[in-house]
Amino acid sequence: LPIMLFLGAKHKEQIESMQKEKLAQNGITIVATDEDEKSPFALLPAINFLRAGGIVSMTGDRLWGEQTYVTVNFLGYEARLPDTPHLFALMTGAPLLTFFVFSDAEGIYHIRVSPGRKVCAATRAERKKAVLESVQIYADDLIRFARQHPFEWHHFEPFLGKKINAVGEKFTK
């Protein structure tokens, strides 16, 4: 199964020095994105890749440069999460899969993959809501994972925003 892996340019350099050729031999295409990249055309190869039946892997919890985002409820705080993976799923009809990697006490790594889900909108007017709902589902999955494996999720940049006022208040932004 062909895989396209989106990485920040600095991470690509690390991968290149170690494994780029081996990854390519195994059907993994590496796409390096620069933090200053603003052109939507940079994403076209991923759309075509998904439509051809491939898998595109990109981070769901880190904003890269000027990347677009939606604000969701994360443990009672605002959190800005990328909307790009969810837009890709909406535009292509490809299922969205969330995966988490963690190690156990013996140092063995495990991968947990969510059931695939579709991001659908019957009309153009419903797209924003569908993407927001999908990103909130991802945030809720991330919360569950972090609670189960509190030392396995790391975020090295400011992540939580303002506290959301009312407990149980539905957050819609």
Language-model segments: residues:
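Non-catalytic C-terminal accessory region of glycerolipid acyltransferases
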Residues: 25-26, 39-173
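Catalytic core of membrane glycerolipid acyltransferases/transacylases, capturing the structured
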Residues: 1-36, 52, 63-73
